[in-house]
Amino acid sequence: MAGGQERILRRRIKSVESTKKITRAMELIAATRVVKAQERAASARPYSDEITAVIVDLIRAGAAKEHPLLRDNPEARTAAFVVITSDRGMCGGYNTNVIRAAERSIAAARAKGLDFSLIVVGKKAQKHFRFQGLAVDAAFEGMTDQPIYDNAREIAAAVRSRYETGELASVELAYTRFFS
């Protein structure tokens, strides 16, 4: 092998090794973020489960019949879908699974003769649905790395007012639940 070609190959090998090191560092950072997100989700799960149980008990007892968020809107012909994805990739099949679940729910709503309203959280869902030519009624970005309560309140306000006024027949969330 000529000296010039050998030098080129050595440079390429060094470049690949450098890229491998950078990729490994990115994997470690992503793994750390996943662990932190899992810890936050796990700490909120008991609270979420208990709140859900209390609401179900209130509904069964008939104590919540008049609450505007628990009554049916039979005249409404629109189902809202809140689709929660990440702002960036590097999260395995998370975004794809959430978007597929949302698309199945949208198809089911259309089969029932309902219109749909898309509320998306994260750039990935927004880009996907706009690429598909679907109207996105509300989009929230920059919340997925470090979500806080105020972010959830902002998203809920966008949906709540429409449900309370009778514009929406239902509201569904599309997300994945982590199982270890």
Language-model-detected regions and their locations in the chain:
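Conserved loop-to-helix interface motifs that mediate assembly, gating, or partner/ligand docking
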Residues: 1-180
